[in-house]
Amino acid sequence: MSTPTSAGARIQANNIHLPFPRSTERMNNRKNYRGANLTTRRPIDTTTTKRQTKRIDFQKNSVAKSDTFPQKSIAWLEPGGTPLASKSAQRAHLLQALQLKHLKQLKQVRQVRQVRQTASSILKRSEHVQPSHRHITMSHMQKSSAYSTMDTNSKIASLSEVITMHRRAPGFHPGLMTDMYHPDSAYVSWLTGLNGLTTFDLYTRSAPFGGAYLLVAGLEAAMEFVQAFRYTPDEIKFLSHIRDYDSAFLDELASLRFTGEILALPEGSIAFPNEPLMRVTAPFREAILLEAGLLQTVNLATLIATKASRIVYAAQKGRPRRVAEFAFRRAQEPLTVARSSYIGGCASTSLLLAAYEYRLPATGTVPHALIELFPTEEEAFEAIANAYNRYTLLLDTYNPRNAIQTAIEVALRTQETLGHTLAAVRLDSGDIVADSIYIRDKLDRAGLSSVRILASGDLDEWKITELLEAGAAIDSFGVGTALGSGSGSPELGIPGGALGAVYKEVWYVDETGTEFPKVKIAGSKSTFPGKKEIYRHPQWEEDVIQLAHEPRPENYHRLFRPVMRNGEMIPGSLPPLSEVRELAQQNLEMLPARYRALTVEEPYPVRFSEGLQALRIQASQLVNKPVQE
């Protein structure tokens, strides 16, 4: 007979649902619990078998055993050891025991969840601060309530254990952040024994958004990915199910760690098409398995940083203006977008999580819903003005020209009575040019010339340029969708949305030490072989890409910086975010204006050395195909 949900309980091995009464008082008042003193009697389970399915049938007023119920007896004792003969008492005590067991398990589950959340939070914070700050001590961990409630043997004692817990969280599997053909390629390499030192270049063939340059970002996340790259036992098992890999190959993957060398352009650097942003040298299988993860981190971050720098540049026409990043609700990777936008020059973010993780300035205005919450616009403005010392009012919920008059009256009144200040007004729709001019005039006439006018609403660098060229009286901008998606301009036929960097093999050293230049022959997609360096003219007249062994051009600056050696991070190679942002702004100021423009007439000159060009011809002859320009 099925057990009614209101009175019964079904216990399963790993999934417990106990719809017990809320209190022992309620239990004693129920018919089935009469005569039971639940506060003084306890059951002792003398069985040694594992937990099995048990069912309590309350309609029969007895304990029913299923086929899998333990056959060993349960002794029911009073606190003093006297056996309990009453079946109702036995049933009630069994119920209490199950309830207590359930509560204990719930507590353990909560503790595990709290520790995992704590570990995740600590790891995320550690990923975005300079390496010298990434120390977690026992005293730090003991401040966590989840940590302090755990048994001594279960406590987390080191950052590596925190990382391990986080890596087990759903959705974080660095070893699986590859395309299917990467482990397939590694398997062919394993079968054939070809695993010599291989050099890959990560670069892009064109600049995004019809511009001339790229603002490099994403290196820190890329290096975190490299350091974390490994396969867990569950992931190895998964790979064994989707492909018939040899078990010895899977054993190698289980212990695989990156042992190679990485050189890269620092975050905040300016780069141009065909210049390697990163040079990776490692045994082939290690290097090939990193391809997709490195491209994903660098592609997105560099795209957004470049987009942000263009938007900020467009906003500076005539005088400085601040740009706030409002992209969270439209961004595919909001934290990456916020961090990269800050590198690109945005003054703040609307996303509190990003402000918390990266210590960014947070900013916000007012939603239309808050204005609509009140019977009248004046009451809404009054409530906002009363709540904050400095506040922003949204003017375009109904009619911005009526709203500005109401805003002025409220601002003057609350300034006199409370000392609160109207800091800004926001326009999100309508005729922003005409309305902003009208509003600026009204504010100035009312003696509120310090109040800024913020514009938002599907803006990008081209729309901002149009607004300012049309004479819009805007002091700052909030940009969301275009920034969060890195979109181009369909109206102007300018693509966007992806950077398109590639990761190409350029050099190979076999087990005998013989070196081989590697080249792809594919028209405009043909590659340049060899281990390269990049040098920049001090006045930004040109960049030179040459072979690593060629002498440096006189007075030119080397752009590559070593980041990782023998699989270990080089101290100081990842500066804090504030320094990255400062470097980016310095480089953007030095970039000649003709190359920083939204559209460029000619690309920045990047020259390939004679030695590099000769090696390309030599490598193409090795594969019996001439280079097609």
Model-identified regions with their sequence ranges:
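N-terminal, Lys/Arg-enriched amphipathic/low-complexity engagement segments
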Residues: 198-254
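Gly/Ser/Thr/Ala-enriched C-terminal appendages of enzymes
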Residues: 151-196, 200, 209-212, 444-446, ...
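Short, intrinsically disordered low-complexity segments enriched in Ser/Thr with adjacent Pro
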Residues: 3, 7-12, 29, 36, ...
